Amino acid sequence: MNSLIKPEGYKPSLDIRMTEVAIKKTKDYFESELAKELNLTRVSAPLFVRPETGLNDNLNGVERPVAFDVKGIGGDTVEVVHSLAKWKRMALKRYGFAPGEGLYTDMNAIRRDEDMDNLHSVYVDQWDWEQIILKSERTEETLKTIVSKIFSVFKRTENYLSGLYPNLQKYLPEDIFFVTTQELEDMYPELTPKERETALAKEKKAIFIMKIGDTLKSGIKHDGRAPDYDDWALNGDIVFYYPVLDLAYEVSSMGIRVDEDSLVAQLKKAGCEDRKNLKFHKELINKELPYTIGGGIGQSRICMFFLGKAHIGEVQASIWSDDMISECSQHNIQLL
């Protein structure tokens, strides 16, 4: 199912060649500032992993990974990563990082079952980051502090780009607003979860929606989350209001990661207790992995937002249906 929002009178602020230069400037600046703000070291990351390790991100539990056999390892099958949520935690231990230190990677992934639209592509590029914390720091206060630091990087990036390209619009407020999924449901009980996000984002301009993955009082979930990386009580999404498309625009999903207790509880709720036999999960239950906070920040997403684009295909080269390509060209949307 392909759906396309076509903003009336849309005209890109930058042509294709200027856009390519601006993409590089945006990514370089944001990456450097994020690493400084969170004390992160860049590390190399895998494009594929062995399924038996349990390291791939199961996302909402139904997305199929791209898998292929490799001649050099006896024809065994490997999977292209969906994200590096679990891999990073094992890497922090293996590389000898200490509390207060972290890593980040340039993560490229293929999500073959993604529904393609203005914001979603089968090609995913993000900065995946992870930082070690103490068990005593697994609190909402820690989460909010890190979110505020990341938001300050967004603010600096917006100011940097508006200095380079004065015709670009600035959309971000001074501060980010914190809200839980239950508070959001209580505020807008008649709306769907996505409609609630847009309603509040439109008012506040930048929000952090906390506690995603568990069931709300209404009996529904705000959104799905895999049970084995984020602690559903200590996670959230950074969401901005994006006037070009008039919607809530998620730029990052993040959270304090599960400990040995919340992992077991969430696996049970999700009906995934068989995962306890996988290598990653065994190490976590046995307290052999560090306590961490981490997340992913969409590279194409932030370029699209800051450069005022109507479609993610204007800031990344991907695959689109013939119908979408045709519609885009009729509405001044210049796909790469």
From Swiss-Prot:
GO molecular function (one)? transferase activity
Highest rank taxon of the organism? Bacteria
Which subcellular locations apply to this protein? Cytoplasm
**Main subcellular localization, coarse class?**
cytoplasm
Record-linked SUPFAM superfamilies: Class II aaRS and biotin synthetases
This protein's pathway: Amino-acid biosynthesis; L-asparagine biosynthesis; L-asparagine from L-aspartate (ammonia route): step 1/1
Q: Which PANTHER family does the annotation name?
A: ASPARTATE--AMMONIA LIGASE
User: Which keywords does the record carry?
Assistant: Amino-acid biosynthesis, Asparagine biosynthesis, ATP-binding, Cytoplasm, Ligase, Nucleotide-binding
In the record, biological process GO terms are:
L-asparagine biosynthetic process
Pfam families linked to this entry: AsnA
**EC number from the UniProt entry:** 6.3.1.1
The UniProt entry's sequence similarity note says:
Belongs to the class-II aminoacyl-tRNA synthetase family. AsnA subfamily.
Gene Ontology CC terms: cytosol
Listed under catalytic activity are: L-aspartate + NH4(+) + ATP = L-asparagine + AMP + diphosphate + H(+)
- What is this protein called in UniProt? Aspartate--ammonia ligase
What species is this protein from? Answer: Ruminiclostridium cellulolyticum (strain ATCC 35319 / DSM 5812 / JCM 6584 / H10) (Clostridium cellulolyticum)
